[in-house]
């Protein structure tokens, strides 16, 4: 019996890493909710209610600094400090506002993708189109309200895959995607999540050519997974697809091979720091509760004093028997856990974690600061390059559903590109002055000088376009 829920061995191997990164990036509440998974219980052999209560207090006092999540957000912010370049034909205009059918624009989809790459080193892009007849013109296309969509898939949701050699090319021949669909209850308010599996295949037709098919599996009445009707999508020209419009996206390359997440070492250190914090906060708790003691007394004195009230402090008389004494016992401070935590904090900063720490920049030389940025951006650059390539490929697949000949679309007419200029230079008055002087001399355009003054960045245009602007300004035809 076939089992659509079968998980690829590499998926099973990497799933714990992905789940750990999700928890750590989500923050303190998610980490603490997992209890002993990330914070082992002292005296775990003791199953008494008292020890359970002690562990809950130990867990509550622990402090989890959200370093990994902050680093991830910072790197995503660096990648999108400059707006991505997005070019598309009119048939794909909807992608600018709703790329996945759930309201996410292409920009937001790209941001989510970079975040997944940093956490999981992997995500999937899949393009589909409603099962309708291809429109013959743009007006008919808009009337149908059927648009190609680009779906971004979490690595956790792509549970199985396989590839084969076809015509001397390695192609994906199987992709199994776990999905959840919502169904509203009869009361109109309640909602249930129903699991299903979407299977993308390359399979031979009657002539031996491999074509793309889609089949959805749902749980039947007997609890077994039942495959629905197979669909064989076609492009705008009515031709079957000879490959699956799906790609894995990775931080090293876009192959199906899985690498370790780039934030995993930082997450492990973050959790180790969390455990040190728990021990340190435990010692702080006990240090803050000194124990009073009395010696040279008996129970009769204690009972009598208790009736009258025992008061300790300035201007208070406490009669003691002969040779009696009163004192305070306090636990010795445990500096070992604090020192271990501080060591790990420094290690996290050395690993390129972007901590929101005011004044930290003053403790670093320019070389050290640039080195930290280089470490982060070398990882981020790889993520961005591969995401750009995958998103541009997905755009071409989407275009193939609605345009007769996608080969005529060049990079100037169809592309998505996240900028790799992660460090904004910022506005420089001297540079603005030089641009103005160059414009006066006819070696640059006033348009470029104006845009730099407004944004602090050079306009993104080709040399030929700048030449046209200069000539237009000289002969008075510039559209300023």
Which residue stretches match the model-derived regions?
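Extended, helix-rich architectural segments
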Residues: 1-158, 478-480
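Alpha-helical structural motif
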Residues: 17, 91, 110, 262-269, ...
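Hydrophobic alpha-helical segments and helix-packing faces
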Residues: 29, 36, 46-56, 334-337, ...
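Short secondary-structure junctions and interdomain/linker hinges
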Residues: 78, 82, 102-109, 116-124, ...
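Generic amphipathic alpha-helical segments used as scaffolds and interaction surfaces in large
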Residues: 100-119, 253-260, 264-267, 271, ...
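Extended, regular secondary-structure scaffolds
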Residues: 118-251
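Extended, charged amphipathic alpha-helical segments
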Residues: 226-367
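C-terminal helix-loop subdomains that flank or include functional centers
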Residues: 317, 343-480
């Amino acid at each position: 019996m076939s089992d659509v829920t079968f998980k690829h061995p590499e998926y099973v191997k990497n799933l714990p890493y992905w789940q750990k990164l999700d928890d750590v990036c989500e923050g303190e509440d998610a980490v603490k909710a997992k209890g002993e998974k990330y914070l082992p219980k002292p005296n775990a052999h003791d199953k008494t209610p008292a020890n359970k209560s002690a562990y809950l207090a130990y867990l509550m006092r622990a402090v989890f600094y959200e370093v990994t999540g902050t680093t991830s957000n910072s790197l995503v912010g660096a990648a999108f400090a400059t707006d991505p370049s997005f070019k598309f034909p009119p048939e794909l205009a909807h992608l600018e506002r709703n790329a996945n059918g759930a309201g996410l624009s292409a920009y937001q989809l790209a941001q989510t993708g970079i975040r997944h790459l940093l956490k999981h080193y992997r995500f999937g892009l899949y393009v589909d189109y409603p099962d309708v007849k291809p429109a013959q013109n743009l007006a008919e296309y808009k009337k149908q309200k059927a648009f190609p969509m680009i779906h971004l898939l979490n690595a956790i949701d792509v549970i199985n895959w396989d590839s084969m050699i076809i015509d001397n090319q390695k192609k994906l021949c199987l992709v199994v995607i776990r999905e959840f669909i919502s169904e509203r209850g009869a009361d109109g308010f309640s909602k249930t999540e129903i699991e299903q599996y979407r299977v993308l295949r390359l399979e031979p037709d009657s002539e031996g050519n491999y074509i793309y098919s889609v089949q959805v599996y749902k749980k039947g009445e007997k609890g077994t997974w039942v495959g629905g009707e197979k669909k064989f999508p076609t492009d705008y020209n009515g031709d079957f697809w000879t490959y699956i419009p799906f790609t894995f996206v990775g931080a090293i390359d876009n192959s199906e091979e899985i690498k370790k997440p780039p934030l995993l070492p930082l997450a492990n250190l973050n959790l180790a720091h969390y455990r040190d914090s728990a021990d340190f906060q435990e010692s702080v708790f006990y240090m803050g509760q000194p124990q009073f003691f009395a010696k040279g007394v008996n129970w009769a004195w204690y009972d009598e004093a208790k009736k009258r009230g025992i008061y300790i402090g300035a201007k208070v008389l406490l009669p003691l028997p002969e040779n009696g004494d009163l004192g305070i016992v306090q636990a010795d401070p445990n500096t070992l856990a604090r020192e271990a935590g501080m060591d790990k904090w420094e290690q996290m900063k050395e690993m390129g974690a972007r901590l929101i720490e005011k004044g930290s920049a003053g403790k670093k030389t320019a070389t050290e600061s640039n080195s930290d940025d280089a470490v982060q951006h070398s990882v981020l650059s790889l993520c961005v390059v591969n995401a750009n390539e995958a998103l541009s490929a997905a755009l071409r697949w989407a275009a193939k559903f609605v345009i007769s000949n996608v080969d005529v679309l060049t990079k100037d007419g169809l592309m998505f590109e996240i900028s790799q200029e992660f460090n904004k230079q910022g506005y420089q008055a001297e540079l603005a002055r030089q641009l103005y002087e160059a414009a006066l001399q006819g070696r640059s355009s006033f348009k470029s000088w104006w845009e730099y003054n407004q944004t602090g960045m050079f306009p993104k245009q080709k040399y030929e376009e700048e030449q046209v602007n200069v000539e237009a300004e000289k002969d008075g035809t510039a559209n300023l």
